[in-house]
Design a protein with these regions (language model features):
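FAD/FMN-dependent oxidoreductases across multiple families
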Residues: 77, 245-329, 335, 341-345
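Beta1/beta-strand and adjacent pyrophosphate-binding region of the FAD-binding site
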Residues: 9-23
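Predominantly flavin-linked oxidoreductase catalytic cores and closely associated redox partners
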Residues: 125-268
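C-terminal helical "tail/cap" subdomain of flavin- and related membrane-associated enzymes
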Residues: 331-438
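Short beta-strand to alpha-helix junction loop
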Residues: 103-124, 247-252
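Glycine-rich FAD pyrophosphate-binding loop
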Residues: 18, 34-53
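N-terminal FAD cofactor-binding segment of flavoenzymes
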Residues: 52-91
């Protein structure tokens, strides 16, 4: 009987695609595959609406919303975001990049979102397109076999163990990195060992007029702050610093966060009359990646595959983009098995390209040479427009943008070399440090 049951299970798995996680990556993938007629089960460990950080979106999210049919609903519940403000105490000024100045003029704005609301919109959209959705159930393991379906095990909120079988598994488990951890392919990213702490505030002072919804990136001595205005009147504020900075804090997290805010005059001024809502949250070991994003019967999407840094608000965009590319790959694997290997290679290449395009800037954002370039924008050969296009999420652009980004990189290296040469020739005193790097 057991052998008969196993044969029946292999012939008739519970679903074509099992999606682990119901955040932006998982819900996007599930919606697209269900729309194409696949039997999809999506399981989320929490229950929507639930809190999540990563509230700032990019203009290139807009065509993805259009494709999913959710743009109007997102717009009704969100704060318009027209650009990015960089604030540098080392230069004594602020610089704003408006998305309308990008090479592609079709998407001149984006949104700041409450992730509890936004993620629920995506989750319900997947269900509306035909995916079977389950909440409050944590997936604990996935077993693969060469000649049969994958076997998935989870535990629901009542402690009951549940099992499913599927022809294909999409790991969208976020920072839990279910498959990357299980398969031993998760690696910390040594180039960006950051951590973050953040909270939400009422009555924070915002920018005036149309710029009210812009994200502010504020540098300070130990890293940088984000300042994200939300449509309900609250503002998300977070500090991203080297992990070592948090280890010697010597006090509780809330008091430490207040002291770090006080050390940044720009943020302290904006929060002078503000009131914190809820507790301070910390997230460590920010950057990591999986050495492979796919296998014979699985793919990883979103944070389950990699996470770099939130400085350019790429998290949700990359998650949804991986969802689109991932859904295409999975659809090919299921409908045209002979082309599965090529489809997965294409997915791997697209994932690496999107991550590498953004990461080059992220790895260098704290370097004086990069700060100098961002704080002194010049549109030589339309390079500023190309950088704006990248900041808007245009990571799969053609040669028109890529060629200008290569020129920007060349100028960065020249600027960095000049800065290092200056330091070697004329060492500065500590009291002159701010002047030297400005």
């Amino acid at each position: 009987l057991a052998q008969l049951d196993q044969r029946v299970t292999q012939s008739h798995p519970d679903c074509d695609v099992f999606v682990v996680g119901g955040g932006p990556a998982g819900a996007t993938t599930a919606a697209l595959l269900a729309e194409r007629g696949h039997r999809v089960i999506m399981v989320e460990k929490d229950r929507h609406p639930r809190f999540h950080i990563g509230e700032s979106l990019l203009p290139m999210n807009l065509p993805l919303f259009d494709r999913l049919g959710i743009r109007a609903e997102v717009e009704r519940t969100s704060m318009p975001k027209h650009g990015i403000e960089f604030v540098s105490p080392y230069h004594g000024k602020t610089v704003t990049y408006n998305f309308a100045g990008a090479l592609d003029k079709r998407f001149p704005y984006s949104f700041q979102v409450r992730r509890s609301t936004f993620d629920e919109i995506l989750f319900k959209n997947a269900a509306a397109k035909g995916a079977a959705v389950i909440e409050d159930c944590r997936i604990t393991s996935v077993e693969f076999s060469e000649d049969g379906p994958a076997r998935i095990t989870g535990r629901d909120g009542d402690g009951e163990i549940r099992h499913w079988t599927a022809n294909f598994v999409v790991d969208a488990s976020g920072r839990d990195t279910l498959l990357a951890a299980q398969l031993g392919v998760k690696e910390r990213n040594p180039r960006n060992n950051s951590a973050a702490m953040y909270g939400h505030f009422a009555n924070a002072r915002r920018l005036p007029g149309k710029a009210e919804g812009n994200i502010s990136v504020v540098w300070f001595d130990h890293g940088w702050f984000w300042f994200i205005p939300l449509s309900d009147g609250t503002t998300s504020v977070g500090a991203v610093c080297p992990a070592s900075f948090f280890k010697n804090r010597g006090t509780d997290l809330g008091s430490f966060f207040k002291s770090v805010i006080a050390s940044c005059p720009e943020i302290a001024s904006r929060l002078k009359d503000a009131e914190m809502i809820g507790d301070v949250t910390a997230t460590g070991n920010y950057s990591y990646g999986a050495t492979t994003a796919s296998g014979g019967k699985f793919i990883m999407v979103g944070d389950a595959c990699a996470f770099i840094d939130p400085v350019f608000s790429t998290g949700v965009f990359l998650a949804m983009t991986m969802g689109f590319h991932g859904a295409e790959a999975v659809d090919t694997c299921l409908r045209k098995p002979a082309q599965a290997r090529r489809a997965l290679k294409t997915y791997e290449a697209a994932t690496k390209k999107s991550l590498s395009s953004i990461s080059w800037f992220i790895y260098r954002i704290r370097e004086p040479a990069m700060r100098n370039l961002f704080m002194s924008p010049r549109n030589w050969f339309r390079m500023e427009e190309a950088v704006l296009s990248l900041l808007a999420g245009d990571v799969f652009s053609g040669w028109q943008i890529r060629s200008r980004l290569y020129m920007f990189r060349a100028i960065f290296y020249a600027t960095k070399f000049a800065h290092l040469r200056h330091r070697l020739k004329a060492p500065v005193k500590v009291s002159q440090a701010a002047e030297a790097i400005s």
